[in-house]
Amino acid sequence: MDTQKYDFNELPTKIDLYTGGITSSCAAYYTTDGKVKKVLNVSAKALSRNVEMMKELVDQTTDKMDFDKAESIRLIIKDRISKLENYLNQNGHITASNRALSYFNEGYNYKDKTGGIGYFKFLCELDKNFNDEALAELKKTADIIFDKNKLTVGVSCEKNDFDKIKNIGQIFDAKDIGNKNGISKKINIVSEGIITPSKIQYVAKAADYKKAGYEYSGKLLVLKNILDLEYLWNMVRVQGGAYGCGCNFIRSGGMYMYSYRDPNLKRTIGIYNKTGEFLENFTADGKAMTNYIIGAVNTVDRPLNMEQKLKTAFIRHISGITDCLRQKERDEILSSSCEDMRSYAQMFNYFAESPHICVIGNADNINNEKNLLNTITAMK
């Protein structure tokens, strides 16, 4: 958008000329004591000779935005609606999974409202009712966010370049406006069908495993490999005809299963619900378990480039993930056994009772199974 120094057309050219990109995204990180830290991440990269210009451009695109050009902002909103709708439809498995988690998980509630279906609906409503009052609220939001008192900075560079970049945190002013937490308002939805002009579905189901008495463990990474490769792939992909499927376990307690470009709906949910039965009877020889363990280790210990190292260190800093905790999880992975995997059967029996389902896709298929969903809406 327009800034105090650059107009709407000039700014992208400057960014492309002097940096490797300036991006922003919202995220929510859970700390090891269960608290949620909601942040707006701004990332930028540049060659050493362009560091000063990069700092100026970051300042312009965050703290020096010009909210007086209403028409330019309106065009940005329309462009964002178009791009976000395309992303949500093309990545329906991610969209549905995040939405299902948002029904009960505070962090994913924030994620949905700042980058998912909740955000998309907000943008559509903002475009429909765009006026001076809405513009003033956007300006107020920017002032609340871009405050030096709330800033955490992470830098990755060569040692000789550190002096050039170490004061980047000084670009923001201290504003002392305070915090606004309304964005965390709970979604009053249990299960949902979201209709799109599609012939297939993305089917996701989620639950909070901590409410079933379980805690996060490195063993869950091994369990994910087993379920992805041995159960879901066979039942949902091979036999069911979906293009993809998977599951995941989140530190905060969220667990979910999803399908990608799935011709089925009710059948897929039934497969999710029978995961406990599969685990009760699970067996594997030593070689197979070793392969599952190696796959899990690969997700926690892999080579990272400089940008990835910075992002990883930043997340661990905010979340309070220490080296001791990471080693504990490695040990849990390496000591995983068939018996450990079978012990999670009860967790999936609890998962089977969860009402939190999100299906994105075909209208006829969703309406035919409306007894599984307490809310049915159109994407747009």
Q: Where are the regions that the model predicts?
A:
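Active/ligand-binding-proximal structured segments within catalytic/core domains
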Residues: 1-14, 58-59, 215-226, 236
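Ordered, soluble secondary-structure elements with a strong preference for glycine-centered loop motifs
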Residues: 2-5, 48, 52, 67, ...
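Charge-rich, well-structured scaffold segments of protease-associated domains
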Residues: 10-184, 240-380
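His/Glu-based metal-binding/catalytic segments typifying zinc-dependent metallopeptidases
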Residues: 43, 150, 154, 159, ...
